[in-house]
Amino acid sequence: DIGGGTTDVATISLGGIVSSRSIRMAGDKIDESIIYYVRKNYNLLIGERTAEQLKMDVASASVEFAKELDSQTIRGRDLVTGLPKTIEIKAEDVATAIQEVVEEIITAIKETLEETSPEIAADVIDHGIVLTGGGAQLRHLPEVIAEATKV
């Protein structure tokens, strides 16, 4: 469950939790990462709403897949002049901005799977992983997780 504030990962069998973990890397952290990246690389201050819009419009869990996506025009305040400024940002840059968060989520999934018994791990291979929450809508996240976990 990739929510706003936390990502909760669990292996569930027969209605009970076999192994789980919760990390404070989720949708809000993705937004913060975008804000920081734009500030650092473009000298542009953007707000949370703009970061969330970028996340929904062009963000991808994969830098490679993001190369195929369109760029986005955003507005903010130029940190050098203090004046309003409009820039074009590539989807690839947004994907780069959020890679640390994506990798933390993948690490949590892998660690949870590593704590799972062989029988339940076999069930996970057969039935797959279920992604829920708003953060699960991040483009290419299922493919990136499948590649990292081989599930």
Each model region followed by its residue ranges:
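Phosphate/ATP-binding catalytic cores across multiple sugar-kinase/actin-like superfamilies
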Residues: 97-124
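Structured core elements
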Residues: 6-11, 45, 73, 130
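Gly/Thr-rich phosphate-binding beta-strand-loop-beta motif of the actin/hexokinase/Hsp70
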Residues: 1-17, 66, 139
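Flexible glycine-/small-residue-rich
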Residues: 1-2, 11-13, 74-78, 133
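Short, surface-exposed connector motifs at secondary-structure boundaries
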Residues: 16-18, 122-127, 149-151
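Glycine-rich phosphate-binding loops at beta-strand->alpha-helix junctions
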Residues: 121-145
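Residue-level signature of catalytic and energy-coupling elements of molecular machines
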Residues: 1, 34, 109, 131
